[in-house]
């Protein structure tokens, strides 16, 4: 979810740290296991604390083999998951699917490969391309984040030059302290990319479990993979769906709208998001779709009046897009969620405008 090389991340470090520390965003203190069906489990990882967010992991145990969706961020967490899987079954993990290239979903690949040497790691072709570019540099990017946080403490100002409040300073200092164990671990990480890529939907039979691997369209990234279990009516969505606040800091929101529509049309009673608790209907998926569509429709209306985006700036259009009507449904009255929502929607408008500029 937290895209460590996104230009927007460094600009939003203070709010990101505040949110990652917020109990109202991620209340679980340890990984939480939910059984979704017979021999199908979701592991919802701690998403805050040390600032290294880990996506959800889904485990599908067949009569012959095990299929894992997303290997999470820190290898130590992946090893804990592997130990849990071995409590459930003595069958080997034969497949790990990385839903997309953000490293909170795939930096644990090496831990799985070490534990199961015959493992096949699957990703969409576009995902592997991005993994190979960005995966090996994880430690360096996190060092830059630490340096940015330290600079804020030293200067007493955020990256926009605004003075830090006493609360902000405490949050940043605590974040640096929490991040140290993860930074130490990243020094020894060996990046493991996908070993098998796909461009078209395919099915794997694990033995009494049919696993369909799908590409429903671009959204969060260029290669978002979705896993569908038709017998159990379960969809594993990756970061196409993130709760409680969508992760829309880059990606392809104009296409994401249709991708979410495609996802909602799968016959599913359970949806596993990339981050957050399991869902049992498509209500939240459609809410995210509607948010993006509202932003795009308002932007298009402004462009129809003002002219093509290539001749405008974001400042020319952002005041014409009002997404406050969605705020209550995403954030309620929680101040941290409201701050996250406002940052997300500002970036949604920015990315939509950038897409429009290329038309």
Predicted features by range, described:
Residues 305-359:
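C-terminal regulatory/interaction regions
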């Amino acid at each position: 979810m937290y895209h460590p090389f996104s230009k927007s991340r460094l600009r939003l470090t203070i709010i990101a740290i505040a949110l990652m520390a917020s109990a109202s965003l991620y209340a679980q203190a340890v990984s939480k296991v939910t059984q979704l069906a017979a021999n199908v489990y979701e592991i919802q990882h701690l998403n805050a604390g040390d600032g290294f967010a880990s996506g959800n992991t889904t485990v599908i145990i067949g009569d012959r083999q095990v299929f894992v969706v997303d290997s999470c961020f820190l290898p130590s967490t992946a090893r804990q998951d592997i130990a849990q899987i071995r409590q459930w079954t003595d069958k080997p993990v034969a497949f790990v699917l990385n839903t997309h290239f953000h490293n909170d979903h795939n930096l644990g690949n090496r831990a799985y490969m070490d534990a199961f040497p015959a493992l096949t790691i699957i990703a969409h072709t576009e995902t592997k391309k991005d993994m190979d570019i960005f995966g090996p540099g994880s430690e360096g990017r996190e060092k830059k984040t630490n340096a940015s946080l330290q600079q804020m403490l030293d200067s007493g100002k955020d990256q926009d030059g605004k003075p830090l409040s006493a609360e902000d300073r405490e949050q940043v200092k605590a974040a640096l302290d929490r991040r140290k164990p993860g930074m130490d671990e990243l020094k020894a990480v060996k990046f493991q990319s996908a070993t098998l890529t796909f461009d078209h939907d395919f099915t794997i039979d694990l033995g009494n479990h049919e696993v369909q691997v799908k590409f429903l369209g671009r959204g969060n990234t260029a290669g978002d993979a979705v896993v569908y279990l038709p017998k159990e009516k379960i969809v594993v969505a990756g970061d196409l769906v993130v709760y409680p606040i969508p992760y829309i800091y880059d990606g392809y929101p104009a296409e994401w709208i249709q991708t979410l529509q495609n996802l909602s049309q799968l016959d599913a009673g359970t949806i596993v998001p990339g981050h957050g608790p399991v869902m049992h209907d498509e209500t939240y998926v459609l809410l995210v779709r509607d948010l993006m569509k509202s932003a795009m429709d308002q932007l298009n209306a402004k462009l129809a009046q003002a002219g093509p985006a290539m001749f405008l700036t974001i400042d020319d259009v952002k005041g014409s897009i009002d997404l406050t009507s969605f705020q209550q449904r995403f954030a309620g009255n929680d101040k941290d969620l409201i701050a996250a929502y406002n940052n997300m929607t500002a970036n949604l408008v920015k990315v939509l405008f950038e897409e429009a500029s290329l038309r």
